[in-house]
Amino acid sequence: MTAPLEELEARRQNFYNGAKRISSSMEMGMAEYSDIAFHIHEGIARITIDRPDRYNAFRALTCEELIDAFNKAGWDRSVGVIVLTGAGDKAFCTGGDQGTHEGGYGGRGTIGLPLEELHGLMRDVPKPVIARVNGFAIGGGNVLVTICDLAIASEKAVFGQVGPRVGSVDPGFGAAYLARVVGEKKAREIWFLCRRYSAQEALAMGMVNRVVPHAELDVEVDRWCKEILALSPTAIAIAKRACNADSDSIRGISAMGMQAVKLFYESPESKEGVAAFREKRTPRFR
């Protein structure tokens, strides 16, 4: 039976009032998480991976909280731009926490960490996502920078992949989309050699948009945010969709690859990489 119009209107109003209360709480910085910090102010949503003692490496809980925060910020009409960063001055994010290595994690209906869901969400939210790169962006952290729509880096920032050193790999956007961003040859170099790159080198290869002195990082990020907020949000949302269109096909291999990685994590080769990392020795893969 169809609900009366008065009842439907009451439901709509209750939902609207609830959404206003949530938005108001976040505006005052009241959104609480364990592994991240989330704050909305003057149209800017700031999401901070808050595990500085682990160089802002993520675990399953971190990913779930990031997904929740991006969902809130992405569909909050008061938000026009999202900034992703890491707590402290040492690291933006250094990828998966090898101290936990939750290859067997099965939450949210996934096999392994819900990274595919997080990566897709960062692309799907109709707001520009800016990476505020304040330090090391290594491994999965480097992938997050690559997926962000824009990236502004401190001159102290360091970039690179580490997956093959520890028996890990990102077979989706972390490799396939990286090749679109920096070029095929450079992407292969990044993954095959696991070298580290300076902020200026990252700028030259197109991984970041701008490099500034560390003390000026927040000023520059705020400047970009304010410029974005002055523009048509609908036009920007459409432009983001258009920019994503050509690389959305990567989702297919990402979905399959992320699930297949679970099998790799259970192999002796991958386990040797993790063991060597924890024991601070050179892995013996062969």
Pin down the residues of each PLM region.
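Conserved CoA-thioester-binding segment of acyl-CoA-metabolizing enzymes
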Residues: 15-16, 21-85, 120
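CoA-thioester-processing core
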Residues: 118-124, 132, 138-192, 205, ...
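Well-ordered beta-strand positions
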Residues: 150, 189, 193-195, 201, ...
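Glycine- (often His-adjacent) and acidic-residue-rich active-site loop
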Residues: 86-124, 137, 165-168, 248-250
